[in-house]
């Protein structure tokens, strides 16, 4: 009688492990902080005209900010980086545990800015830099930023000759590992399949952190978060894929 039981148990365990190792699509986004205006956020071809905390699916999204527009997060009205305010329009997605891959084709257009973050892994900390960020500078050169808890060689940029210039579509990819037990994240970034940035074993904030998904719950942010604007700018994300598997 024991042999059939062990066979069934083995089959069940094999099936469970196979299911756990499969990639699963994640697609539950939310607006971050609020809407700047009725043209600032276009989801799947339809403008978001009112703000709420409901989740929605995203295949493509366009973020647009005009000159002088201030973001809706409380900190956006405060001076930072030598500028009087921050412009912001973003959406967020909870970061699952295990391995997560984000992919999208990004297209920028319009006026440059002093700096604009277009991808972040945040932990809801109230001050200081979040664990991982990718931005463009005033010449549209892609640069990395990260929390002050990570240093070279774990956190570094591998090449500086990379751009997101207006009118040039680029394939962006982030490979993320969220270790819930160690309370850390690792991320590797690629542009047109070129490995450009790594942030490894970056610790999450231990206190004073409360984001849209609860205390110390990391999440992804995409969109425009800029200072030093010089005019209207758009960031378009097409063919968005966010997938995860437990490990």
Spans of features found by a protein language model:
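Sec-dependent N-terminal signal peptides
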Residues: 4-13
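Boundary at the C-terminal end of the N-terminal hydrophobic targeting segment
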Residues: 18-20
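Ligand-recognition surfaces built from glycine- and aromatic
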Residues: 23-28, 96-99, 205-247
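Extracellular glycan-recognition surfaces and repeat-rich motifs
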Residues: 29-70
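Secretory/extracellular carbohydrate-interaction modules
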Residues: 58-144
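Residues within well-ordered beta-strands of beta-sheet-rich folds
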Residues: 99-107, 171-179, 236, 241-243
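Short, aromatic/His-centered strand-loop micro-motif at the edge of beta-sheets
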Residues: 146-173
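Carbohydrate-binding surfaces in secreted/extracellular proteins
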Residues: 171-204
